A protein has these predicted regions:
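Signature aromatic-anchored transmembrane alpha helix within multi-pass, membrane-resident enzymes
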Residues: 107-114, 260-264, 280-284, 298-305, ...
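Membrane-interface transmembrane helices that cradle and orient dolichyl/undecaprenyl
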Residues: 199-203, 243-259, 385-391, 431
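Membrane-proximal, lumen/periplasm-facing interface regions of secretory-pathway glyco-
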Residues: 129-140, 444-492, 509-511, 657, ...
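Transmembrane-helix signature of polytopic, membrane-embedded enzymes
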Residues: 31-41, 180-181, 197-219, 238, ...
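Disordered, acidic Ser/Thr/Pro-rich linker "stalks" and the adjacent N-terminal cap
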Residues: 544-555, 568-638, 648-653, 660, ...
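Membrane-embedded, hydrophobic transmembrane alpha-helices
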Residues: 1-94, 545-548
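Short periplasmic/luminal acceptor-recognition loop of GT-C membrane glycosyltransferases, typified by
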Residues: 479-526, 694, 698-707, 734
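Hydrophobic, aromatic-rich transmembrane alpha-helices
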Residues: 115, 358-401, 438-443
């Protein structure tokens, strides 16, 4: 039954998309040919359906009956209006008959390759979903939204702040058929992409090149693994290519109604993935160049905003940042730190590769560093330059260039998928007249992309076989998933952690398989702060190590500010202050509730420099630079003769001065004598760190055996105030002994 439910959920969702798109393209006057109607109508309908589901989620009425009724309405309307039907076949001279020998040769290669890989992909998509991002992130948010029947404000996971246009289609599929249904919907986008490439080749009079390019795209190992899981990259590629396709249809007829479809899809590009919005740039530029008029451009932009603005508004309302999780420097908020964003983006630009000149080999043959490969055949990508000699080739190379530019923001192989339709067609249209060469090229690509052959030359992320028994649930779903450690961790969390409780993890979980919320150390400010405190518990380099004191001129002060004047030597270095203390005649001024504390940057964390805990610290969460400051307003003048800062050992370039306000209210430096000494704590900070996590609502830790600090948690669990509930599948689940942790008060 689970297998049938998964198939039903996917088929129902795909049918609704196709029905909705069919009705829309009929009313736009689009004269689609038989071979191109399904891919173009399906993707266009997906854009519109995603917006309807967005509205359902916003209204908090995402119940299974509501979603089924929505899908049923789309299918029924298309059937009643007759728009569901495919156009009658037409005999076009441009697609004229091929020589018999060529037809047989190409038919054999095309038929065998398409059939074999369709079976491979179908059963992999149908099998239980356990892909890294699919089961954790994409379906994690879908299952979370369905539990609350709509959108939920999530400030603890930066991944959930991205636009979720493709995931909206996973919502009804998941509600009906769970995880595999969503993966099958993505597989439908893979099919649509291949058919669209094939259709475009036929439309421009290059049927062989179109067929070969469709296989070049769809047989690529990275397309296979991505398009059969609940990722979104293949769907994004299909949406982007559809924008190009509709723009070319408009260029043939100059029917302005077709720009509505192109505009909706360009906006849907943004809803699918931020960088895909570059297709609006392409569409606007092409239409403006061809018409020299502003009215068509307004139609394009207006329709695109219909799709994009809801996602911009959602992020603005929930996170105070319309393009979260990016641009936090320009849209400051307490949820995502600037430095984490920059470190993450820097890593995405390199993936640990010392030399980016190795990228061509990495993404085509190796694939381990960039998490997937296109296939060796794409080493022939320079063939695309031959397309510049033809008008049709230049039409393809312009969007390819625009999309390819965005790739360098994240050089993972799957981020090249949107380039493949344009690149593949451009590579092969010059070979239209050399059918045997096309057949050999596709045969080579098919052989080198088949799983058993792939394993001989790479260990990159790719499909490993045809899991038909798992797909048909001849192997029980629980048994199939149980072979994956990540799934077992999720079940461990579900078993021990009470509903509503948070779990902190250094590893991440397949969130779609648990109803508990996991805080991954990297994805949000709350997790960053908890991880920082816990790391201090076992890593002495992060603990307080220096006392910087400033002897002030005698007098009374109301406002004091410590200003950073040093410059970091590495981007990761921050300004960290564990405690800022004020003294008079050797006695610390007692902290009062009326004190006003401020800091720049990170004003939200300033209290950590005044909480009397060495297991916390105010951090700039930006690279240490001159001009940063932390201020205390005593609300009245008080005698102060010393400012003392407790600094950690991982800030090497911090240099500071103390300022106060002058008679005119402006800040003026004080002639303060600086003293510095090192300190060492004899008392462990482990339990203090645990208390900080407990204080923020975290009473459970999932620690993998090879996580940093894992040995310390296991060996000194009593010192941490933890009880290990279970150790299995290479990970331990700990519970905080809340009766054993208390507010820290360790002072040097």
């Amino acid at each position: 039954m689970k297998a049938l439910a998964a198939l039903a959920g996917a088929v129902f969702t795909v049918a609704a998309c196709y029905g909705l798109g069919s009705m829309l393209d009929a009313r736009l006057g689009a004269r689609l040919r038989r071979y191109e109607k399904f891919p173009l109508a399906f993707v266009l309908g997906a854009a519109v359906l995603h917006l309807a589901i967005f509205a359902v989620m916003a209204l908090q009425i995402a119940y299974k009956p509501v979603l089924i009724a929505m899908l049923s309405g789309c299918v029924a309307a298309a059937l009643v209006t007759g728009d569901w039907r495919l156009p009658a076949p037409e005999d076009t001279k441009r697609d004229g008959p091929l020589p018999t020998a060529v037809r047989y040769l190409f038919g054999i290669v095309f038929g065998i390759s398409a059939t074999a890989f369709t079976a491979l992909y179908l059963f992999n998509a149908w099998a239980p979903e356990i892909s890294p991002d699919g089961s954790a992130y994409h379906l994690g948010l879908v299952s979370r939204y369905l539990r609350v029947h709509g959108f939920e404000r999530v400030t603890t996971n930066m991944l959930l702040s991205f636009s979720e246009g493709v995931e909206m289609l996973y919502v009804p599929a998941f509600a009906i058929g769970r995880h595999s249904a969503a993966a099958l919907v993505h597989f439908a986008f893979l099919v649509a992409l291949a058919l669209a490439v094939l259709g475009y080749g036929k439309r421009i009079g290059k049927p062989l090149a179109g067929a070969a390019a469709a296989l070049l795209v769809s047989l690529s190992p990275i397309v296979g693994i991505d398009g059969t899981t609940a990722y979104t990259d293949v769907a994004t590629a299909a949406i982007m290519f559809s924008v190009f396709y509709w723009i070319q249809l408009w260029d043939e007829t100059r029917d302005s109604r077709l720009l509505i479809a192109a505009g909706l899809l360009a906006g849907y590009c943004y809803a699918a993935k931020y960088t895909a919005f570059v297709m609006l740039v392409y569409a606007v530029g092409f239409v403006a160049w061809r018409t020299r008029k502003w009215q068509p451009v307004i139609v394009l932009v207006g329709c695109s905003l219909t799709m994009a603005v809801p996602w911009i508004a959602k992020d603005w309302i929930y996170l105070h940042n319309p393009v979260a999780p990016f641009a936090n420097q320009w849209f400051p908020n307490p949820y995502f730190y600037v430095l984490i964003e920059k470190i993450w983006m820097a890593r995405m630009r390199t993936y640990g590769l010392a030399n980016l000149w190795t990228l061509p080999l990495e993404v085509t043959i190796r694939g381990e560093a960039t998490q997937g490969l296109l296939g060796p055949v794409f080493l022939a990508a320079p063939l695309a330059l031959l397309a510049l000699w033809s008008r049709e080739g230049r039409k393809l190379m312009v969007p390819f260039a625009l999309v390819f530019i965005t790739y360098f923001g994240n050089i993972g192989t799957r981020f090249l998928i949107p380039c493949l339709p344009f690149l593949s067609l451009a590579m092969l249209i010059a070979l239209e007249g050399v059918a045997p060469a096309l057949a050999l090229l596709i045969a080579f690509h098919a052989v080198t992309s088949w799983p058993t052959v792939l394993m001989r030359y790479t260990h990159a992320w790719s499909l490993s076989g045809i899991p038909y028994k798992a797909a048909l649930r001849m192997i029980p779903e629980e048994e199939y998933l149980g072979a994956h450690h990540e799934y077992q961790w999720a079940r461990m969390v579900e078993k021990y952690v009470p509903p509503g409780k948070l779990v902190f993890t250094l590893t991440g979980l397949p969130d779609s398989y648990t109803t508990r919320e996991a805080l991954f150390i990297y994805w949000g400010a709350l997790s960053n702060d908890i991880g920082d405190a816990l790391t201090m518990g076992w890593n002495k380099a992060w603990q307080p190590a220096r006392l910087s004191s400033f002897i002030l001129p005698g007098g009374k002060y109301r406002r004091l500010r410590v200003v950073q004047i040093g410059t970091a030597t590495i981007p990761e270095e921050q300004w960290n202050i564990h405690e800022m203390r004020l003294f008079h005649r050797g006695s610390e001024l007692p902290r009062r509730p009326e004190w006003r504390l401020q800091a720049s940057p990170n004003p939200w964390g300033v209290q950590r420099a005044f909480d009397n805990s060495e297991a916390t610290r105010w951090r700039s969460w930006e690279t240490l630079r001159p001009g940063m400051w932390i201020t205390v307003d005593l609300r009245r003048e008080e005698p102060v003769d010393r400012v003392q800062l407790e600094l950690s050992g991982d800030e090497w370039d911090a240099r500071m001065r103390v300022e106060t306000t002058g008679a005119n209210g402006s800040w003026v430096p004080l002639a303060a004598a600086a003293e510095e000494r090192t300190v060492r704590y004899s008392t462990s900070l482990r339990r203090s760190a645990t208390y900080e996590a407990h204080l923020r609502g975290v009473d459970y830790f999932l620690i993998k055996d090879d996580d940093f600090g894992a040995g310390d948690y296991a060996e000194f669990s009593d010192d941490w105030g933890l009880t290990r509930l279970e150790h299995a599948y290479g990970a331990s689940l700990y519970k905080v002994n809340s009766d054993q942790v208390s507010p820290p008060g360790v002072n040097p």
